[in-house]
Amino acid sequence: SISRRLGVSLRADMEWKVAKTATFEYITAQLEFSQQSSLSAILCDIPNIGKTFTARYYVQNHKNAVYIDCSQVKTKLKLVRKIAAEFGVDAKGKYSDVYEDLTYYLRSIENPLIILDEAGDLQYEAFLELKALWNATERSCAWYMMGADGLKEKINRSIECKKVGYTEMLSRYGDRYSKVTPDDGKEREAFL
């Protein structure tokens, strides 16, 4: 439809109020640090704690930061074209041209940050392409991957099975998973 192509909403969106919770503060601090230093990280935590809201809010208020819902762009082609489109790079045409234009653009702007939410939904080829994109933009672009505990399990299982690319990808994202909520059940309940 024309409204979809132009990005026009046909209904009023509910306005959300920002509650600066411990989750909001933690993720915002991580995103700011990542963007300012062009470092990458992975956040894996339980659902419904405000990860997505915080990431979207951050992108609205910070230059050169984009939010990608990976559950909507699971394939390599869709993912790269979506990232390009979010930065205003031409996402149509030959894939190789889109890829080259995107990596060139990311290396030429100041402190780009790409937030990959629901990253556990990405297909294997898309994960490999993230590694390639990271390599092509090293020290000039920050990448922040987010997901629930399933993302951590997917990466760990793939590393244990010696699936090509996962060990390298984890190392590029800091070799660890960050988490907001406490592991202990009683502490987590008090936190939430």
Residue ranges of predicted features:
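A short helix-turn-beta junction within AAA+ P-loop NTPase domains corresponding to the substrate/partner-engaging
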Residues: 63-65, 158-181
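Hydrophobic/aromatic beta-strand patches that form the interior of the parallel beta-sheet core
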Residues: 41, 66-68, 144, 177-178
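A short beta-strand-to-loop transition that corresponds to the Sensor-1 phosphate-sensing loop
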Residues: 145-151, 155-159
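Mid-core helix/loop region of P-loop NTP-binding domains shared across ATPases and GTPases
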Residues: 75-82, 89-144, 164-165, 169, ...
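Conserved catalytic segments around the Walker B and adjacent sensor/switch elements
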Residues: 62-72
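A short, basic N-terminal segment
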Residues: 1-38
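Walker A/P-loop nucleotide-binding motif
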Residues: 36-57, 71-72
